[in-house]
Swiss-Prot record:
This is Bifunctional protein FolD. Its EC number is 1.5.1.5, 3.5.4.9. It comes from Chlamydia felis (strain Fe/C-56). The keyword Oxidoreductase applies. Catalyzes the oxidation of 5,10-methylenetetrahydrofolate to 5,10-methenyltetrahydrofolate and then the hydrolysis of 5,10-methenyltetrahydrofolate to 10-formyltetrahydrofolate. It holds the Pfam family THF_DHG_CYH_C. GO terms for cellular component: cytosol. NADP(+) binds at residues 160-162, 189, 230. The keyword Ribosomal protein does not apply. It catalyses: (6R)-5,10-methylene-5,6,7,8-tetrahydrofolate + NADP(+) = (6R)-5,10-methenyltetrahydrofolate + NADPH; (6R)-5,10-methenyltetrahydrofolate + H2O = (6R)-10-formyltetrahydrofolate + H(+). Pathway: One-carbon metabolism; tetrahydrofolate interconversion. The gene is folD. Keywords: Amino-acid biosynthesis, Histidine biosynthesis, Hydrolase, Methionine biosynthesis, Multifunctional enzyme, NADP, One-carbon metabolism, Oxidoreductase, Purine biosynthesis. Signal peptide: none annotated. PROSITE patterns: THF_DHG_CYH_2.
Amino acid sequence: MLLKGTPVAERILEKLKQKISQSPTPPGLAVVLIGNDPASEVYVGMKVKKAMNLGMVSKAHRLPSDATLTDILKLIERLNNDPTIHGILVQIPLPKHLDSNVIIQAISPEKDVDGLHPVNMGKLLLGQLGGFSPCTPAAVIELLNYYDIPLQGRHVAVVGRSNIVGKPLAAMLMQKHPTTNATVTLLHSQSQNFTEILKTADIIVAAVGVPLFIQENMISPNAVIVDVGISRVATNNDKGYMLVGDVDFNNVVTKCKAITPVPGGVGPMTVAMLMKNTWESYQKSSS
C-alpha cells in the first residue's frame, strides 16, 4: 500500500482555507531566507505561495549570505514585535558562519511555527500542551494516523537523530497518548546490530539523509516504511537528476506492508503542518 501524503495534505489545507476565509483578519507567516541556496529558494517560494493560496499574508525576507548575526537578530526582533505576523520560519541550512541555535532561540516561542525553539522542544519532551510540534515529525504521525496504522504498543525504529526530525519524532511517538504510545528505538551511525534491530520494527521511519540507505534485506516483510529523506541523484534523463528518498523504494515496495512515496509522501504533509501551526498561532493571539 502506498501512503500518499498529497491527498491528505490537501484535505488539511482545504479545511484551513475555509477557517481563514471566515476570520476577520488573515494570519501572517514570515519566512527568512539567508543566502542564495537554490534548493532553499525553491522551498521558501513554495511555502510563501502555499500560505497565500490559503488566504494568509506571507512574505519572504531575504538577507545576503554574508549577513551578520546582528542583522538577522534585528529582523527577527522586528518580526517578533509585529502583531500581524503569527509565524516566523528561518529556512535551514544557514551559511556556515551562522549559529542556527542562536537564531532559532531569538524567535518568540509563540511564533516558532517550525517547533524548534528550546521552549517548544521542552514542552514536547515533557508532554505539555501549548507548544508547537516540529512540522516533519508531526507530518509523520498525522500520515500514519490518517491511514489507520496503529502506533500504540508497536515497535517504531527511527533511523536518524537530528534535532529537526529524529529526536523530536522519537519524543512524540513515545508520548502516552492514544494516537502514539509506541515503543521507540532511535538508530544512528554508531548503533550496534543495526539491521537486526531494524528487522524487528513494525514501523520504520527513515530520516538519515542518505539516498537509498534502507535496503530490502534490512526490513521485515510486514514493516510499514515512512521515508522522510529527499535527495537529488544524477541520472541520464532530461532533468539530469531524479528525486529519491532514504529508502530503496523500487526494491523495498514489493516486500513491505506499506510505504510512503518520494516525492509525494511526507513532504506535502510537512508543509501542511507548517500552515496548521501558523493558524494555531493566529488563534492563540486572537483569544
